[in-house]
Amino acid sequence: MATLVLSSMPCHWLLFLLLLFSGEPVPAMTSSDLPLNFQGSPCSQIWQHPRFAAKKRSSMVKFHCYTNHSGALTWFRKRGSQQPQELVSEEGRIVQTQNGSVYTLTIQNIQYEDNGIYFCKQKCDSANHNVTDSCGTELLVLGFSTLDQLKRRNTLKDGIILIQTLLIILFIIVPIFLLLDKDDGKAGMEEDHTYEGLNIDQTATYEDIVTLRTGEVKWSVGEHPGQE
């Protein structure tokens, strides 16, 4: 047992040195450093679902907010760098409902203008506590295109088709014509070199051609050469 105590001493010293030279000590976090909705107030328990939603244009989306407090709850929407705006119910499109501790926001026939971050805010009994859900839900509307965007896309498609056609002509048709021209050139060169190397001075004239002299016939007329 003594050996175990002695062997553990260097480890303790090493740990102490690491803690000493690792950096300045960080003070403990106090309750004042926590966000307002995490300080244990009655409004601290707020959950929102889902965290992200991507929907097609003209479809429907629902956001749910759960709370353990009975105070009034309001929905807000934040677009980009703008300030959050309170949502106002629209008959047949934006509907806010409550079922016990569950608050539901329903948006029908969503459009591109509905993009943004949605979150709920609850007013507690205490006058100094207004808690906003820190996470919220981001809505992304898909499939929205204006007339100008469609025109630009069609122009881009036409340009891509034209470029592809030019590339096909450049890399397929042009090499074929080059190969055909090369074959025609080879055939012409072979025809041109038919009499190449023939020297006219070395050719024989008609006077140099030896006349054919036939020898005397050994057989008589009417006698077959194969007969003795």
UniProtKB/Swiss-Prot annotation:
Residues annotated with Phosphotyrosine modification: 195, 206
Annotated S-S bridges: 43-124, 65-120
Domain ITAM: 184-212
Task of the protein: Required in cooperation with CD79A for initiation of the signal transduction cascade activated by the B-cell antigen receptor complex (BCR) which leads to internalization of the complex, trafficking to late endosomes and antigen presentation. Enhances phosphorylation of CD79A, possibly by recruiting kinases which phosphorylate CD79A or by recruiting proteins which bind to CD79A and protect it from dephosphorylation.
Protein location: Cell membrane
Organism for this UniProt entry: Mus musculus (Mouse)
A GO MF label: identical protein binding
CDD domains: IgV_CD79b_beta
One GO biological process term: adaptive immune response
Alphabetical list of Pfam families matching this protein: ITAM (PF02189), V-set (PF07686)
Topology within the bilayer: Single-pass type I membrane protein
Cellular component GO terms, alphabetical: B cell receptor complex; external side of plasma membrane; IgM B cell receptor complex; plasma membrane
Keywords: Adaptive immunity, Cell membrane, Disulfide bond, Glycoprotein, Immunity, Immunoglobulin domain, Membrane, Phosphoprotein, Receptor, Signal, Transmembrane, Transmembrane helix
InterPro entries: Ig-like_dom, Ig-like_dom_sf, Ig-like_fold, Ig_sub, Ig_V-set, Phos_immunorcpt_sig_ITAM
Domain Ig-like V-type: 41-132
SUPFAM superfamilies found in the cross-reference section: Immunoglobulin
Record remark: domains: The transmembrane helices of CD79A and CD79B chains and two IgM heavy chains assembly in a four-helix bundle structure that appears to be conserved among different BCR isotypes.
Transmembrane stretches, start-end: 159-180
Signal peptide boundaries: 1-25
Protein name: B-cell antigen receptor complex-associated protein beta chain
UniProt keyword Signal present: yes
Subunit structure: Heterodimer of alpha and beta chains; disulfide-linked. Part of the B-cell antigen receptor complex where the alpha/beta chain heterodimer is non-covalently associated with an antigen-specific membrane-bound surface immunoglobulin of two heavy chains and two light chains. Interacts with LYN.
